[in-house]
Amino acid sequence: YKRVEPLDILLALSINNVRALLTLTLGLMALIWSLTWDFRMDSPGLALCVYLLTISMAVGFGICLVFLGKFNKFITRLIKRLINRILIFTSALFFATFELPAHTRPFVTWNPLLHAVELFRYSLNNEYPIPDISLSYLIWCSTVTLGFSLILYRTNEALLLESLDD
């Protein structure tokens, strides 16, 4: 048999997490439909595109964290405790971007997760206002994050293989 690569393990974990999140999302949509007998999705293609871009960005971010954790455990703890909270708080899960004053929006629109959440809301209802939100920014962030992580993996694969042999 072919030797299992570290990327195979990371991708298997990612696929399992995506499967779980997709099941929860579809279950929630089915629950909404069964309770209200009304469910509309104005742009299902946009919703699928945003969902896949968010997944690819998360996989890239996870691969980067694996390598950062190999170099310094403190960075991993810092990212898990502090940076994750900042990303979640500024990702528009608790507020809508159009409710913010225009002069405060630049402080949160740097977050690509905010763009993903707002674009997903827009795909459900095309009348939802999305000021300063861009699909191209989400595509750029996903591509750069995944590309950087794959380059990092390719150049430092031996480091992971050495640590697995211990």
Where are these regions (language model features)?
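Transmembrane helix segments
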Residues: 69-110
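Short hydrophobic, aromatic-rich alpha-helical segments embedded in or entering the lipid bilayer
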Residues: 95-130, 134
